[in-house]
From Swiss-Prot:
Protein name (record): Uncharacterized ABC transporter permease YvcS
A GO BP annotation: transmembrane transport
Sequence similarity: Belongs to the ABC-4 integral membrane protein family.
Coiled-coil residue spans: none
Native source organism of the sequence: Bacillus subtilis (strain 168)
């Protein structure tokens, strides 16, 4: 019997241990192959797909993420496989197998698995690539459907890339074998574990880091997040690592000392197993909780943004079709009757119309950070105009005294209150006249379109506006015209037609909502679709890590279960013990990852000024369902494997 035959028999003998790793590799290869096939598909070009280069860039970024994650996962798995088989390697060495022969045998085993994974992954990729192309055709509104094609470059990149990856990481891991002595290999599984210890200072540090990271995340707006994202990431990672290596030990030692509950039922066995294996599990729990947080945060944030996209568009572009005439005495951008006739011919229904004038003013505003001032611009309008649009949009109306005013900003992200409530502010007209108002609370509502980047409206009482407008010639005022359309999402064609009717020198003064909404929606939907693929890969890999960890301890668990049965522990109690131990590994990282993601969701809600609680619950619930199913299947396989060894 040669080494290749032994390698094949070893794979079949350790099939339960290898299956999760193999399937994870197959999925990674298949996703890589499908994405590569799309990127290099002859039909994927700018002529056929609007924004085709952007799509390719997104998919290429996803490929980099997959490769980096595969490096991490394969390295971890190879290390776990070698650790689990130390005793077997020690016995083979004792019976005369040289370290060179041992390394060859392991090399053959891993090479067979990697070649099979590449072949199966490409086969699965070919099988599902047509479905992927159909989905992408629908999502990207492709002019000519993307046909099924065998892309040679995808084959070459997938086979060459993963062969190099598997072989390089395998050779690096084999270097560990020659450093181990026979006695260390044989006794590796027999080394007694001492009660784990912890540092009080590191325990406090973990809680402080997590608390600080959560606080920074929960209180951040869009401007803050630009500066806080890396500190939050570092604090949460440090806090999570020391939470599992230190704080969890402190918590379980506290449970260990509670004798009234420690000796109740099977708690003595479950808690003892958990605390004595905690140091072994700490790194894996840290990694899987971080992976869970990444999956929930990435998928959740994109899904929440997608769900809130329509409201964001209606906020930033207040009317479906709108424009500003910088000389209110005439129409240079477009005549209202021209727009109305075009909309009528396209069977677009107008729900309300805005035709209002405003007076440009300037004021001194604080920079977002620091104590410096800058000159800013605003458009002074009447509360009558504001309330007209507010009623149509379902916003509360506001009534002002003659000396009162407030600032309205259409953008809710990157917004800092311009003035404090009750503050007296000065505004300057072009004529040199200075206006003074007591400022009411700032509103961030989508009322009228921004004018040349001027997003602030200064809303004053009707009486005050009428008095001021009498002294300002109409040609020095600005006119804002806008139309809100029924089912505006379906008005892309007429919106683009109106855009083409605007003189080139006035294109920046004209705004439509439907075309930009469809482009952004398409981009976010693509990100969500790609993100789901990558998230599923992360989820499978995370589950594989848990599965692998349990099967590396299966021999010790089998010995323990046999001892428990001999002292009278029932089958029901043994099933309960195993279920709790597996549940701990599956759901503690889930809880930690969910908490991390929850604060990321809170930050996004603050940034968008929107309640995204329902979307967060949906994402977390879906993930929990898949995690629970994975747990049930793994528990069944693991219990059966343990009991078969008795």
């Amino acid at each position: 019997m040669n080494l290749r035959t032994i390698a094949r028999k070893n794979i079949l003998g350790n099939l339960q241990r290898y299956v999760a790793y193999f399937l994870s590799c197959v999925f990674a290869v298949s996703v890589f192959f499908v994405f590569t096939s799309f990127i290099f598909h002859p039909d994927v070009n700018e002529d056929n797909i609007y924004g085709g280069s952007l799509v390719k860039t997104c998919l290429s970024a996803a490929l980099v993420v997959i490769i980096v994650f595969c490096i991490f996962f394969i390295t971890y798995s190879n290390s776990a496989f070698l650790q689990a088989r130390k005793k077997e390697f020690g016995l083979l060495t004792l019976f005369g197998t040289s370290k060179q022969q041992l390394r060859k045998m392991i090399y053959y085993e891993q090479s067979l698995i990697s070649l099979a994974a590449i072949a199966a992954g490409i086969g699965a990729g070919l099988l599902f690539s047509k479905l992927f192309f159909m989905i992408m055709t629908w999502m990207l509104s492709v002019k000519v459907p993307i046909s099924f094609a065998i892309v040679p470059k995808a084959f070459v990149m997938t086979i060459a890339g993963f062969l190099i990856l598997f072989q390089t990481l395998l050779i690096l891991s084999l270097g560990r074998i020659r450093k181990l002595e026979i006695i260390e290999l044989i006794k590796s599984a027999k080394k007694p574990k001492s009660l784990p210890v912890y540092s009080k200072w590191l325990t406090v540090l973990s809680l402080l880091c997590l608390g600080s990271g959560y606080y920074l995340s929960a209180t951040a707006n869009a401007i803050d997040m630009m500066f806080r994202v890396f500190p939050i990431l570092i604090l949460v990672l440090i806090g999570t690592y020391f939470f599992f290596t230190q704080s969890s030990v402190a918590f379980f030692r506290m449970l260990y000392r509670k004798k009234h509950s420690f000796y109740k039922g099977t708690n003595i066995i479950v808690r003892s197993n958990m605390i004595f294996r905690l140091k072994d599990h700490a790194r894996m729990l840290f990694l899987t909780s971080v992976i869970t947080a990444v999956i929930l945060t990435a998928t959740g944030v994109i899904y929440m943004f997608y769900s809130d996209l329509q409201r964001q568009e209606e906020q930033s572009i207040p009317q479906s079709v709108s424009w500003v005439e910088k000389d209110a005495s005439r129409f240079q951008v477009m005549k209202p009757e021209t727009a109305e006739n075009t909309l009528k011919k396209a069977h677009a229904v107008i729900t309300y119309k805005v035709d209002a004038t405003g007076i440009p003013v300037t004021f001194q505003s604080d920079l977002p950070y620091g104590n410096k001032k800058m000159e800013a611009e605003a458009l002074l309008i009447s509360e009558k105009v504001y309330n007209q649009v507010a009623k149509e949009k379902g916003f509360p109306v506001i009534h002002l005294q003659e000396n009162e005013a407030f600032i309205n900003v259409s953008f809710q992200m990157m917004v800092k209150d311009t003035f404090g409530e009750g503050e007296t502010a000065a505004f300057h007209m072009k004529s040199g006249k200075t206006l003074s108002y007591v400022m009411k609370k700032q509103q961030n509502k989508g009322i009228l379109m921004s004018v040349d980047g001027v997003s602030r409206l200064l809303v004053v009482s009707e009486k005050s506006f009428d008095s001021l407008s009498q002294d300002v010639p109409l040609k020095e005022q600005m006119r804002m015209v806008g139309y809100e359309l029924e089912h505006w999402q379906e008005t892309v064609d007429v919106s683009e037609k109106l855009e083409n009717m605007v003189p080139k020198e006035h294109t920046s003064d004209f705004q439509t909502r439907a075309p930009s909404y469809q482009i952004v929606k398409q981009g976010v939907a693509l990100m969500l679709f790609i993100g789901l693929f990558v998230s599923v890969l992360f989820f499978i890999v995370q589950g594989s890590m848990l599965y692998l960890r349990m099967f590396t301890e299966i021999e010790d668990t089998g010995v323990q279960v046999l001892a428990l049965k001999r002292i009278g522990v029932t089958d029901k109690e043994i099933h309960s013990i195993l279920g709790k131990q597996i549940g701990f590994l599956f759901f503690i990282p889930f809880i930690a990852g969910t908490i991390h993601a929850g604060f990321a969701y809170a930050a996004l809600s603050n940034m968008l000024n929107s309640n995204l609680f329902l979307e967060a619950v949906i994402v977390i619930f879906i993930y929990f369902v898949f995690q629970a199913l994975y747990y049930i299947v793994t528990r069944h396989i693991y219990k059966r494997a343990v009991l078969q060894r008795m």
